[in-house]
């Protein structure tokens, strides 16, 4: 579900939005507004459009690359949370209070500090003041590319293969929240959701479409879905779904089509595709609707990892049998071995020099 709507009436507000973005970038480019450079190297992962590029799996990919050598903190806004002010996320937190994506990251990587704060500069200053033995050695800043109040050591811009920012327009006519030329500030561009059947000529054509600078690398990532996994821990696991099972797929994410395609590939008998808004907070009515879908012994509900974080807090409202029929598809992203090595080298160099001499 893309946010942009190509309604001609939205052209005027899109022009005004683009003008405002241009003024803001000009003020930073000319030094009239100042960014903050942290003493801790910051790896920024973001995009110039809203939603649908898979930022969280790429944050997790970077964590996997770095966690054996550095103490890591993830800094995120915690979009959609009801909690106010800064927060350190724990594995037992409620997604409604800290955000679904921060909770997902913390549950996967308990050793990583996950810090939620909309004020990125304040958050970095807080992390800098931690005792030396606990202070992170690198901060991965999620969805922070447009936040120029922070100067990263290394910036990564994500863009979807089937909807690159070069073919987009400013919000609300399109989905751009920053000028496409802002991508020049990034050291790397990752093209996400690259189809498995892409030929070398397709990749070269995409590289030709992107306005790459000499100092920029481009990478192509692919989603890797795992097997359907029970969402709730239970003493009495239920039967696993089979390709013949009757499946209802539920997604409250920015661009659910890739997820739905995978569910239909794994389970050809998928009957229902239910779409909610990104970060949708599940309520009693939603839960009742979902419960009705899994009353039959051969019915299962499969959702995304991110939705799963929001559903966990409703465990007490479900019977053990119902909990056993709710699963999620874990997702990671992969690069080719050659690109993975190159990307890792660039990250380590940026961390070592805190962004200098890239």
Task: Give the ranges of each region predicted by the language model.
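Residue-level preference for the first positions of well-ordered beta-strands
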Residues: 42-44, 71-73, 136-140, 246-248, ...
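Walker A (P-loop) phosphate-binding motif
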Residues: 25-91, 196-197
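Residue-level signal for inorganic ion chemistry
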Residues: 16, 56, 105, 142, ...
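A transmembrane-helix-recognition feature enriched in membrane-embedded lipid enzymes
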Residues: 1-40, 343, 350, 354
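ATP-dependent carboxylate-amine ligase
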Residues: 2-3, 68, 150-157, 161-358
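Rossmann-fold NAD(P)-dependent oxidoreductase module
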Residues: 61-65, 142, 262
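Phosphate/Mg2+-binding loops and adjacent switch elements
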Residues: 78-214
